Amino acid sequence: MISSFRAQCAARVVREGGVIAYPTEAVWGLGCDPWNEDAVYRLLALKARPVEKGLIVVAANIHQLDFLLEDLPDVWLDRLAGTWPGPNTWLVPHQERLPEWVTGVHDSVAVRVTDHPLVQELCHLTGPLISTSANPAGRPAARTRLRVEQYFHDELDAILGGALGGRRNPSLIRDLVTGQVIRPA
């Protein structure tokens, strides 16, 4: 896979501990390396989001999430594989394989395999990323690059330009264990 220069630049920022904005399937997102504590706390501060709530981790393909999925029952893995890639976020038992600054106070973590080509490209370069809507708490999610810039001014380390994926609503969130819909699409 030949990566675009802009995706390579954004990936370098992520690897160096930066926080970026990028287009997703429905809204602009903020992202960083989920294993970089300083970057995650900076992202949370930008959003004014409590760490206890937890965050979504997005990946380019299901194999990038193997570390979370390897011990899950086959029926659950089939459920995931049948909905990915796509706008389906699942709450998956994290089994303490991700840090608390990602999972919050929960026994599960929200994960998604994206079908957005630019986000896939970025995740191929960085590995899984934090993916949370680009907006301060209580404000509407950004649907344009201009809105991202208005919300965060020069507080981001990079903005990866590109088009949204065409969906009107953020991803559906379901609990993998119970099947319960947590957030409808």
UniProtKB/Swiss-Prot annotation:
GO terms for biological process: regulation of translational fidelity; tRNA threonylcarbamoyladenosine modification. Pfam families: Sua5_yciO_yrdC. It is an enzyme of class 2 (transferase). The keyword Nucleotide-binding applies. InterPro entries: DHBP_synth_RibB-like_a/b_dom, Sua5-like_dom, TC-AMP_synthase, TC-AMP_synthase_SUA5. Keywords: ATP-binding, Cytoplasm, Nucleotide-binding, Nucleotidyltransferase, Transferase, tRNA processing. Its EC number is 2.7.7.87. Its main location: cytoplasm. It catalyses: L-threonine + hydrogencarbonate + ATP = L-threonylcarbamoyladenylate + diphosphate + H2O. The keyword rRNA-binding does not apply. One of its GO terms (cellular component) is cytoplasm. GO terms for molecular function: ATP binding; double-stranded RNA binding; L-threonylcarbamoyladenylate synthase; nucleotidyltransferase activity; tRNA binding. It is found in: Cytoplasm. Required for the formation of a threonylcarbamoyl group on adenosine at position 37 (t(6)A37) in tRNAs that read codons beginning with adenine. Catalyzes the conversion of L-threonine, HCO(3)(-)/CO(2) and ATP to give threonylcarbamoyl-AMP (TC-AMP) as the acyladenylate intermediate, with the release of diphosphate. Belongs to the SUA5 family. TsaC subfamily. This is Threonylcarbamoyl-AMP synthase. It comes from Pseudomonas aeruginosa (strain ATCC 15692 / DSM 22644 / CIP 104116 / JCM 14847 / LMG 12228 / 1C / PRS 101 / PAO1).
